[in-house]
UniProtKB/Swiss-Prot annotation:
This is Protein CHROMATIN REMODELING 19. ATP binds at D239, E240, M241, G242, L243, G244, K245, T246. It comes from Arabidopsis thaliana (Mouse-ear cress). Induction by the mutagens rose Bengal (RB) and methyl methane sulfonate (MMS) is enhanced in progeny of Chernobyl plants exposed to ionizing radiation thus leading to a higher resistance to DNA damages. Residues 1-43, 114-149 are annotated as: Disordered. Residues 592-742 form the Helicase C-terminal domain. Pfam families: Helicase_C (PF00271), SNF2-rel_dom (PF00176). CDD domains: DEXHc_Snf (cd17919), SF2_C_SNF (cd18793).
Length: 763
C-alpha cells in the first residue's frame, strides 16, 4: 500500500507494534496544520534566462523523470512545466540554447518501495561485480555517458557547472572574490533559519539543554537547507575535523521535520566507535525523534520486525535508524537480509559520517550502500578529509553524492583524473564549491586553542640498531639471487624484481624494528623455541589435538614479546624465561616516552598515544606500567557498547593520565578533549589518518593548547614515511584550499615501499 507521508496520522505513529528496547520514544511536538496543497519549492533560478520574451521548448521524450522549466522572461509568477529529457546532456553549444533541468525537492513521498524494486535477488546482484544495472554509476538515471571516455569528466563538470552557477548566486549574491574557494563562512548570504528557529526546534520542555550553535555552524545548517529547498540530492559537509559536523547534520534533520514536515525516515551510517555518540546527540538535539540503533545481538529480531512492517506498507517505527559501515561490507546471510530490509524503505536522507570510507567506488561497501541510498531524497556526506590520496577518490565521493551527474560507469578514472592537470583541479574546485561546504579551524575559530606540531627524532638503542642492520644484511642477501637475473642492477630493477608480498613483508619488518625490536624474534633462538614448545605442548596451550611439530612451527612464527606473553600466561619455567622490564626499554621510542611522560604528568597534561599495531599497544601498556602512570585502552577489539564508556571515563576522571588507542579504531569520531597532548607513536602512509587522530582532542570544547608529537626513528624507514606523508598533504591543500599545481604521480604504497627498499638494500 502506497501512502503519502501526510496521510500517516500521529495515532498510527504511536500505535505501531515495534517495541524494541533500543527505540527511544519521545512525545512528539504537535505539527503545524499543513496547507491543503504544498507548492513545489521554487527552482526558477536554475532555468536558463534569455534576454528575450517568453519562449516554450517542446520535447518529444516521454521520460517523466525530470521536468523542464519554461522561462517566461523575468517573471516568477508563471512557470510552465512540460515533459522532457534532461537537456543538460547535450553538447555545450546546445546547452546554451536550452534550459537547465533540476529535479524539484520532493514533498509527497512514499514510505515503502514496491517489492518489485527491492526483490530478494537485488542483494545477490549487488554482490556481483558484473551487475552494472544494480550499481553501475550508482543509479545514474538518464545522465549516461556521451562521447568518448576521455570526455566523461568534462561532460560531468559541464552538467554540474550550470547548477553551480545559480547556487553560487544564492550563497553569495553578487559578491565577488568568492569563486576560488569552497563555500565560505563569512560570505554566505543565505538566511533560511536563525538561532531562534534552532531554539524552537531543538528545545525540549523538560530539559535545561540550550541548543546554541556557533555562527559558522548556523551557516552550515542554512547551507544544507538551501540545497534541500533547491532539490539538490546530495552534499558534502567537509568542515575540518573538530568543528561539529555531527551537530550541524542533526540540527538539519530536526529542521526538516519542523519546517518541511519531513520527519524521515533517515538512515545514518557511521563507524561502530561513534554509534553511541550519535544516539546521545540525537536524543539531545532531536527530542521529538524516535531513534533505533540497528546493531548488536538484537539486530536479527529488529530485522524481522522491520521486514514485516515494510511489507505491510506501514510507516517506520523510527525517525532515525543508526547502522554501521560493516553492515555493507560482509556477505553473511544475516548481512544480506539486513540490506534487503533497508532497501525496502524509502529514505528521506541517507547520512554518512566519516564518508571518506566511500573513497573506492569499486568496493563492496560503496556498491552495497549505494543500492540502499540510490532511492533516497538526499545523500549527505560528512567528512573532514574529502581528499585523502588522489582525485579519483574525490570523484568516488561525488558520484555517490550526485550519481545523476557524476556517474562514469566503466570508465577508468585513474587514467583521466591526473593530479598534474592544473586546469582540471582549478575547474573542479570552482564548480564543486556550492556543493561542498569546507571550513577550516583557521577560518572560523580564531578563538580555538592553538595546535602545536612537534617531530621528535629519536636515535635507536644499540641492540635495536644491531637488529635493524642484521635485517638489512639478511634481506640484501636474499635479494641477490633476483638481482643476478637482471641485466641492470639499478634501483628500479630491484623494486620490480621483488614480488609485492615480499616487498610488504620486508618493509613491515623494518617498521617493526623501528618501533620496537621485541616485535621480531631475536632474543629467543630456534633452540629456545623448540624447548619452550615441548613444555607448552603437554599442557594444551594450542589445543590437545595439536601435534608437537605443529606447536614448534607456530611458536617459531612468534615474536619475542608474544613468546614472553605465552611463558607468562602459562607459568612456564625455562632457561630463558620471561623478559624483564629492561627489555621494554630497548626501543628508542619507549625510552623517549619514559623521559617525556613523567614531566607531562607533573605539568598537568593528559595524553593520547596512537599506534597502528595492537601488538605495539600491548608493549606500550607494559611501558606505561613501568613508568608508573594510569591509562585506559581502546582499539578495534573493544566492544562497541564499551567504547563510549571508556571515552566518558577518560574525559571525566582526571586521575587517568593517558589513553592508548589504535589509529584506525580510535582515530575516528571520538571526542577526547580531556587530553591536551597527542603522541603519534608510528605514522600512517596516509597523513589524513593521523590528522584524524590529532583532532580527537583538538576540537570544540578544548580549553588548553594542544601539542602533537610525532615519534620518528632516525636512519630508518620512519623518515621515509614521514616525508611521503608531508607530500600527500599538499594535494589536499591544492584542491580544497588554494588550487595550486601539485606534482603527484599517484604511486601505490607497494611501489613506494619498493623504491624505499631498493634504496635501503642497495645503499
Amino acid at each position: 500500500m502506497k501512502r503519502d507521508f501526510d496521510e500517516i496520522s500521529e495515532e498510527e505513529w504511536s500505535q505501531h507494534s515495534f517495541n524494541a528496547s533500543r527505540v527511544l520514544k519521545r512525545p512528539r511536538t504537535p505539527k503545524k496544520t499543513r496547507a491543503a496543497t504544498n507548492p513545489t519549492p521554487s527552482i526558477e533560478s536554475f532555468a536558463f534566462r534569455r534576454p528575450s520574451t517568453a519562449m516554450t521548448i517542446e520535447s518529444n521524450s516521454s521520460d517523466g523523470d525530470c521536468v523542464e522549466i519554461e522561462d517566461l522572461g523575468d517573471s516568477d509568477s508563471d512557470v510552465k512545466i512540460v515533459n522532457g529529457e534532461d537537456l543538460l546532456l547535450e553538447d555545450e553549444e546546445e546547452v546554451e540554447e536550452t534550459k537547465v533541468v533540476m529535479r524539484a525537492a520532493r514533498v509527497g513521498r512514499r514510505f515503502v518501495i514496491e517489492d518489485e524494486e527491492a526483490s530478494d535477488d537485488d542483494d545477490d546482484e549487488a554482490e556481483s561485480s558484473a551487475s552494472e544495472d544494480e550499481f553501475g554509476g550508482g543509479g545514474g538515471g538518464s545522465g549516461g555517458r556521451r562521447g568518448e571516455d576521455e570526455d566523461v569528466v568534462g561532460k560531468a563538470l559541464q552538467k554540474c557547472a550550470k547548477i553551480s552557477a545559480d547556487l553560487r548566486k544564492e550563497l553569495y549574491g553578487t559578491s565577488s572574490g568568492v569563486t576560488d574557494r569552497y563555500s565560505e563562512v563569512e560570505t554566505s548570504t543565505v538566511r533560511i533559519v536563525t538561532q531562534n528557529d534552532i531554539d524552537d526546534a531543538c528545545k525540549a520542555e523538560d530539559s535545561d539543554f540550550q541548543p546554541i550553535l556557533k555562527p559558522y555552524q548556523l551557516v552550515g545548517v542554512n547551507f544544507l537547507l538551501l540545497l534541500y529547498k533547491k532539490g539538490i540530492e546530495g552534499a558534502i559537509l567537509a568542515d575540518e575535523m573538530g568543528l561539529g559536523k555531527t551537530i550541524q547534520a542533526i540540527t538539519y534533520l530536526t529542521l526538516l521535520s519542523r519546517l518541511n514536515n519531513d520527519p524521515g525516515p533517515h538512515l545514518v551510517v557511521c563507524p561502530a566507535s561513534v554509534l553511541e555518540n550519535w544516539e546521545r546527540e540525537l536524543r539531545k538535539w532531536c527530542p521529538s525523534f524516535t531513534v533505533l540503533q540497528y546493531h548488536g545481538a538484537a539486530r536479527a529480531a529488529y530485522s524481522r520486525e522491520l521486514n514485516s512492517l515494510s511489507k505491510a506498507g506501514k510507516p517506520p517505527p523510527f525517525n532515525v535508524l543508526l547502522v554501521c559501515y560493516s553492515l555493507f561490507e560482509r556477505h553473511s546471510e544475516q548481512q544480506k537480509d539486513d540490506r534487503k530490509v533497508l532497501k525496502r524503505w524509502r529514505w528521506s536522507c541517507v547520512l554518512m559520517d566519516e564518508a571518506h570510507a566511500l573513497k573506492d567506488k569499486n568496493s563492496y561497501r560503496w556498491k552495497n550502500l549505494m543500492s540502499v541510498a540510490r532511492n533516497a531524497n538526499q545523500r549527505l556526506m560528512l567528512t573532514g578529509t574529502p581528499l585523502q590520496n588522489d582525485l579519483h577518490e574525490l570523484w568516488s565521493l561525488l558520484e555517490f553524492m550526485l550519481p545523476d551527474i557524476f556517474t562514469t560507469e566503466n570508465v577508468d578514472l585513474k587514467k583521466l583524473l591526473n593530479a598534474e592537470d592544473t586546469e582540471l583541479i582549478t575547474r573542479m574546485k570552482s564548480i564543486l564549491g556550492p556543493f561542498i561546504l569546507r571550513r577550516l579551524k583557521s577560518d572560523v575559530m580564531q578563538q580555538l586553542v592553538p595546535k602545536i606540531q612537534r617531530v621528535e627524532y629519536v636515535l635507536m638503542e644499540r641492540k635495536q640498531e644491531d637488529a635493524y642492520k642484521e635485517a638489512i644484511e639478511e634481506y640484501r642477501a636474499a635479494s641477490q639471487a633476483r638481482l643476478v637475473k637482471l641485466s641492470s642492477k639499478s634501483l628500479n630493477s630491484l623494486a620490480k624484481a621483488l614480488p609485492k608480498r615480499q616487498i610488504s613483508n620486508y618493509f613491515t619488518q623494518f617498521r617493526k624494528i623501528a618501533n620496537h625490536p621485541l616485535l621480531i624474534r631475536r632474543i629467543y633462538s630456534d633452540e629456545d623455541v623448540i624447548r619452550i614448545a615441548r613444555k607448552l605442548h603437554p599442557i594444551g596451550a594450542f589445543g590437545f589435538e595439536c601435534s608437537l611439530d605443529r606447536v614448534i612451527e607456530e611458536v617459531k612464527g612468534f615474536n619475542d614479546f608474544r613468546i614472553h606473553q605465552l611463558l607468562f600466561q602459562y607459568g612456564v619455567n625455562d632457561t630463558k624465561g620471561t623478559l624483564s622490564d629492561k627489555h621494554v626499554m630497548l626501543s628508542a621510542k619507549c625510552r623517549t616516552l619514559a623521559e617525556l611522560l613523567p614531566s607531562m604528568k607533573k605539568s598537568g597534561h593528559r595524553v593520547l598515544i596512537f599506534s597502528q599495531w595492537t601488538s605495539m599497544l600491548d608493549i606500550l601498556e607494559w611501558t606505561l606500567d613501568v613508568i608508573g602512570v594510569t591509562y585506559r585502552r581502546l582499539d578495534g577489539s573493544t566492544q562497541v557498547t564499551d567504547r563510549q564508556t571508556i571515552v566518558d571515563t577518560f574525559n571525566n576522571d582526571k586521575s587517568i593520565f593517558a589513553c592508548l588507542l589504535s589509529t584506525r579504531a580510535g582515530g575516528q569520531g571520538l571526542n577526547l578533549t580531556g587530553a591536551d597532548t597527542v603522541i603519534i607513536h608510528d605514522m600512517d602512509f596516509n597523513p589524513q589518518i593521523d590528522r584524524q587522530a590529532e583532532d580527537r582532542c583538538h576540537r570544540i570544547g578544548q580549553t588548553k593548547p594542544v601539542t602533537i608529537f610525532r615519534l620518528v626513528t632516525k636512519s630508518t624507514v620512519d623518515e621515509n614515511i614521514y616525508e611521503i606523508a608531508k607530500r600527500k598533504l599538499v594535494l589536499d591543500a591544492a584542491v580544497l584550499e588554494s588550487g595550486v599545481h601539485v606534482d603527484d604521480n599517484g604511486d601505490t604504497p607497494e611501489k613506494t615501499m619498493g623504491e624505499i627498499l631498493a634504496s635501503l638494500l642497495m645503499g
